[in-house]
UniProtKB/Swiss-Prot annotation:
Protein function: Catalyzes the formation of aromatic C18 estrogens from C19 androgens.
Native species: Oryzias latipes (Japanese rice fish)
EC assignment: 1.14.14.14
GO molecular function: aromatase activity; heme binding; iron ion binding
Protein name, UniProt field: Aromatase
Keyword Cell division tagged: no
Swiss-Prot/TrEMBL catalytic activity: testosterone + 3 reduced [NADPH--hemoprotein reductase] + 3 O2 = 17beta-estradiol + formate + 3 oxidized [NADPH--hemoprotein reductase] + 4 H2O + 4 H(+); androst-4-ene-3,17-dione + 3 reduced [NADPH--hemoprotein reductase] + 3 O2 = estrone + formate + 3 oxidized [NADPH--hemoprotein reductase] + 4 H2O + 4 H(+)
Gene: cyp19a1
Pfam families: p450
Amino acid sequence: MDLIPACDRTMSSSCLVAELVSIAPNTTVGLPSGIPMATRSLILLVCLLLMVWSHSEKKTIPGPSFCLGLGPLMSYLRFIWTGIGTASNYYNNKYGDIVRVWINGEETLILSRASAVHHVLKNRKYTSRFGSKQGLSCIGMNEKGIIFNNNVALWKKIRTYFTKALTGPNLQQTVEVCVTSTQTHLDNLSSLSYVDVLGFLRCTVVDISNRLFLGVPVDEKELLQKIHKYFDTWQTVLIKPDIYFKFSWIHQRHKTAAQELQDAIESLVERKRKEMEQAEKLDNINFTAELIFAQGHGELSAENVRQCVLEMVIAAPDTLSISLFFMLLLLKQNPHVELQLLQEIDTIVGDSQLQNQDLQKLQVLESFINECLRFHPVVDFTMRRALFDDIIDGHRVQKGTNIILNTGRMHRTEFFHKANEFSLENFQKNTPRRYFQPFGSGPRACVGRHIAMVMMKSILVTLLSQYSVCPHEGLTLDCLPQTNNLSQQPVEHHQEADHLSMTFLPRQRGIWESPSPF
């Protein structure tokens, strides 16, 4: 899809100098005798200036050729057609770890070099993201919420509410909520032979999010259907051109899908508001309650409250739950790792319920989770925009340049001893943060990174201490059809529902061999 950069073949200044100088073996001889000495000196001076200029030019960034505008068009079409993640991997594999492409006519850099990625993540010049304003407006994210809010001042203000809810004292209750919710959903399984694992994990995670951050009764399956449609709309409209939104008949279906979830969340927020008004005493001020108070004090609009609750609710079902799904597949593909993990769980947790103090002791589990996030992450890139001119690894970056940080590829190319293998040896030693960025770092790092680790550990321990999870024959990570647009997702079709299911076989503590599903 990319053009051979033949259109870029122009004579460089150094070539011009070489041609001028090579007219004769001695530059003071060989010129026509009629040319005065002053003219000869001027020619030599120009040649020297051209040589200096050619060596002081900024580094050129590799990438597809511009070629009369066809290069930007073709690279943009690749992103639209194959997805952001897939296209980013394609260009890094083809051109290297720093690549220049175009998205919707805007210059975009794709970075998978650790030093460049670290520079962008830590630098406040890149606290904004890029995306279609009309697309973000369609899903309610334009200058609202936290995920793609590019109003930096408002984003900083809103982030404080998320930080309070996702860190500190609120983390203490997370383990108990996760264990209770996971156990409840395990007890409610109608069959252990054909478990819809993705559905089980999504329902569990939505329930946990509701208990921690909202606190009102919800229909989990109905809400999950709306979340799925919203996510599909999100990745469909994020980088679409403005002309796409000129024709309502084209994007109306996606706009309706986004509105359905927004209306559902608004209804839940209103229910929470009424409960607060009717309560004699408010013992538990959770995330949604804090936002409602902020709205009452004029600090946040009703639309922002709705969007913040929406983003808190959707953050886990299509990221954390799918991460857990990938982890279960990798666990069964690496039985020696499963053995280590079960031995650790039985030794540290035993017959008791998981406690907060157990988490730090589960070192094998932590290495396993980190290796899964490195080897096959759900979200393997992040999007930024340069707010000021800058230099990244010697390359000049102009204000307004789009940046894609391809951390998934970075994790496979630098530092790790067995970068292309799934191995816990990759985390035997402490890994410098700049080489391992599953949640990002710096001012715009994932605010939920700590609670995400607690949730994953709690769910895995509760599940694996009771059941051996057995994917059906042929279900492996390599054979699993996947897409990679905003995130890596398994392709789900109704006719393939059984193929994605697994069998849960009861296990006894202290017995570490997987029982046969037959």
